[in-house]
Swiss-Prot record:
Complex formation: Heterooligomer composed of large and small subunits.
Name of protein: Exodeoxyribonuclease 7 small subunit
Chief location category: cytoplasm
Gene: xseB
Keywords: Cytoplasm, Exonuclease, Hydrolase, Nuclease
Keyword Hydrolase assigned: yes
Task performed by this protein: Bidirectionally degrades single-stranded DNA into large acid-insoluble oligonucleotides, which are then degraded further into small acid-soluble oligonucleotides.
GO-annotated cellular components: cytosol; exodeoxyribonuclease VII complex
Origin species: Marinomonas sp. (strain MWYL1)
Biological process terms in GO annotation: DNA catabolic process
GO function term, MF aspect, one: exodeoxyribonuclease VII activity
Amino acid sequence: MSRKTTVRHFEENLSELDTLVTQLESNQLSLEEALKAFEKGVKLSQECQSVLTQAEQKVQILLEKQDGEHLETFDPELNS
C-alpha cells in the first residue's frame, strides 16, 4: 500500500471512528446496533493505532540514520 493510500485510509478510518462515537454518544441506537458500532469502532481503532505505530517507527529510523545515534523509545507519559 502506498504512503498516500495509507494516509487516506487512516484519515477515512479516523473519520468513520468519529462518526461511530457520535452515534454511540447519541444514545439513539438499539443495543444490537450499539454493539455492532462498538465492535466496528474497536477494529478501526486498532487499524489506526497500527498505522501510527508504523509511522513512529519510520520516524525513529529516519532520525537514527540522520544523527547516527541510538534513540530511546518515545514515552508520551514522560513528556506530558
